[in-house]
């Protein structure tokens, strides 16, 4: 078997990966701090916030497919995805500031409306366009499977590094900026500007391959012919796309539950800065795992086994976190949190490569190139999983009797925090581990190639674009 052609230098991979600094400026700030900002600073009801977020998610499922289709049909000098990545984040920056700049002199109804409009525009329109385009670049700037894994690893190293910093310093940063509503607004402005700069650098650091390099003329003709309905059918008939989407949704739902750590640290551990400590024990092991993921994938000659066994480790780790949490043993909680994060890391690094293989599966079975819409699962997962998770957090907090104006919360609220922060993440990891044990798309592709009598390199060169 001939060696795969390489397309990227190290600085292209690093530049691309830095784009998740911008994505996590939005995502980490929203999932970790939006609820506690709205309840404890603005004074809004957690249950109402949860309902508004849930309603906002109705728009998300529609816009994900729409933007994925639009990217597939875009043809500009910059390429298919880069224009959406660049211009989409301008809207992200503006609406992110809007979410954290709710006027205190408005009545509650107007504040809820302000939040809903800004939050929906941020998630359903601008973040969708930016994130799907950013993810799709993995398939548009290289056809080399190993480079795709490396791009994913660089990407998520930046993602978790950014998430770590935001989770670790935001509470103190808000206080340094004056605290209260003004402090949150100032921090959001600073984060948005940083994200805008880094997103631009990332988009300009890679070059999309030409149509001629990506596919032959026959494939291009097919690509421009499929309709929205056909694209949807291609996706739902690809069982691996469904698996990846469900996994991504559960994973982001998991992130929303871990975001309850802001409340858990403040009201259970009686020290809100402990949230930052837990962030270190989550993100450092994730980054370590990401660094070694490409090497392990190459050594094991595949992704499936690594994802399967590493998530088993993650599941055991979260079970032990729950046990330590109910024991009240913080050092053990931190240690097992690190173990769980170490197990979750490989999937974060090789996920984009799995999606690329999933796209190849669609080409092998349906003979259609749907890379842009295939990567809609990442944005769909972030918004439905993270957004719906945040919504459920709000509803459960309200149901438990939580009141942001109270210094000491009732026992029912404390018990609910234990369930959301300790039990639910373990259950989610268990489900994800089961799905990953069934997600052997590499084997499925190899069997189809053998049946069709198509060489491995020929398929990689012509279909994974």
Label the predicted regions.
Residues 2-464:
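Membrane-embedded alpha-helical bundles of multi-pass transporters/translocases
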């Amino acid at each position: 078997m001939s060696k795969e052609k390489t397309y990227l230098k190290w600085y292209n991979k690093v530049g691309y990966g830095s784009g998740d600094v911008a994505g996590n400026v939005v995502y980490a700030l929203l999932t970790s701090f939006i609820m506690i900002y709205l309840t404890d600073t603005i004074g809004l009801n957690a249950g109402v916030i949860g309902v508004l977020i849930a309603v906002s998610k109705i728009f998300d499922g529609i816009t994900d497919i729409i933007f994925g289709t639009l990217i597939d049909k875009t043809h500009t000098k910059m390429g298919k995805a880069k224009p959406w990545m660049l211009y989409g984040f301008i809207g992200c920056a503006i609406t992110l500031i809007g979410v954290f700049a709710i006027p205190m002199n408005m009545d509650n109804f107007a504040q809820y409306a302000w939040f809903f409009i800004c939050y929906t525009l941020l998630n359903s329109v601008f973040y969708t366009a930016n994130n799907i385009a950013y993810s799709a670049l993995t398939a548009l700037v290289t056809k080399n499977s190993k480079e795709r894994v490396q791009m994913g690893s660089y990407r998520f190293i930046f993602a978790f590094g950014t998430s770590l910093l935001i989770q670790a310093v935001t509470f103190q940063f808000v206080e340094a900026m004056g605290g209260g509503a003004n402090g949150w607004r100032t921090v959001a402005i600073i984060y948005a500007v940083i994200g805008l700069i880094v997103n631009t650098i990332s988009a300009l650091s890679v070059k999309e391959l030409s149509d001629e390099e990506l596919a032959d003329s026959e494939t291009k003709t097919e690509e421009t012919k499929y309709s929205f309905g056909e694209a949807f059918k291609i996706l739902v008939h690809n069982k691996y796309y469904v698996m990846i989407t469900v996994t991504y949704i559960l994973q982001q739902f998991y992130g929303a539950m871990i975001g309850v750590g802001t409340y858990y640290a403040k009201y259970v551990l009686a020290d809100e800065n402990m949230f930052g400590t837990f962030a270190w024990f989550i993100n450092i092991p994730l980054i370590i795992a990401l660094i070694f993921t490409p090497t392990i994938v190459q050594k094991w000659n595949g992704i499936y086994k690594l994802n399967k066994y590493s998530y088993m480790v993650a599941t055991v780790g979260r079970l032990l976190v729950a046990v330590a949490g109910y024991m009240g043993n913080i050092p053990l909680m931190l240690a097992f949190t690190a173990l769980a994060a170490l197990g979750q890391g490989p999937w974060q690094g090789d996920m984009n490569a799995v999606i690329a293989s999933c796209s190849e599966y669609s080409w092998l079975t349906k003979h259609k190139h749907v890379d842009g819409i295939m990567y809609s699962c990442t944005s769909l997962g972030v918004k439905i999983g993270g957004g719906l998770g945040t919504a459920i957090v709000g509803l459960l907090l309200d149901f438990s009797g939580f009141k942001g104006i109270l210094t000491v919360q009732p026992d029912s609220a404390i018990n609910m925090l234990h369930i959301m922060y300790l039990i639910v993440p373990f259950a989610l990891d268990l489900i994800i581990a089961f799905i990953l044990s069934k997600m052997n798309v590499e084997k499925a592709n190899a069997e189809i190639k053998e049946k069709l009598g198509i060489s491995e390199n020929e398929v990689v060169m012509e279909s994974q674009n």
